[in-house]
A protein has these predicted regions:
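Class I S-adenosyl-L-methionine
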Residues: 1-216
Length: 216
């Protein structure tokens, strides 16, 4: 078992933390698995009417093979067993962490591991994006509820179609719209910042429950 230490963590852990995110995610540490080994993601990409058909993570993981290697190792580690507390990453001077920047949760074991990571880092906000809310809800039920420092964001599966939260655990819904639909329906885009660090809308409770982004 390999151990890693991120510039954002105070300990070594077999869970790899991405600490060199770019674009709007610059400065945000992330714990991710790979879209390339996710059967849920593959099935949704095959359906042309989903936002997954436009997935940026596929090209990113294919281009950055080392990053994909770490993400696939995270998948194997997090999906197959509940990790002992001493194996979980402990974050230092960090305000928030992204869960799943390049994939999605696949099973309850993985979701429980993410919840445990949040529990051992009570001073950090974890923004968790997912389309597989049922899996996460089962994990939260199993551990006695959602940790208070997790903001669960349900991603709408289709472009231009905002879904309703599928669980009481969901804090926000994230929907992507194309420019034509935005213009014709006067959709307010409130995720347009060039920096998640400066915006923080998705990592702050009490802000808008519906987050809208332009399709890239």
């Amino acid at each position: 078992m390999e151990f890693y230490k991120s510039k954002y963590t105070v300990n070594e852990s077999p869970v790899y933390v991405s600490d060199n995110m770019t674009g709007k995610m610059a400065g945000v540490p992330a714990i991710s698995t790979s879209v390339l080994c996710n059967t849920f993601c593959a099935a949704r990409r095959a359906s042309g009417d989903t936002v997954c058909a436009h997935c940026f993570a596929v090209s990113t993981m294919k281009r950055y093979t080392k990053a994909n290697e770490h993400a696939e190792k995270n998948a194997a580690l997090l999906m197959n067993r509940i990790l002992a507390k001493e194996l979980l990453p402990i974050f230092g001077n960090v305000r928030f962490v992204r869960i799943e920047a390049f994939g999605d949760v696949c099973n309850v074991t993985q979701a429980v591991n993410y919840a445990h990571i949040a529990k051992v880092n009570p001073g950090v906000i974890f923004g968790w994006w997912s389309k597989n809310i049922r899996i996460i809800a089962r994990a939260f039920d199993q551990i006695g509820g959602k940790p208070e420092n997790i903001i669960l964001i349900e991603s709408s599966e289709k472009v231009n179609v905002e879904k309703e939260p599928s669980s009481p655990y969901v804090d926000k819904v994230f929907t992507v719209y194309d420019k034509k639909f935005i213009k014709e329906n006067a959709v307010e885009i409130n995720c347009g910042a060039r920096s998640c660090v400066s915006c923080q809308r998705c990592y702050t409770k009490g802000t808008e429950a519906k987050v809208h982004e332009i399709l890239k």
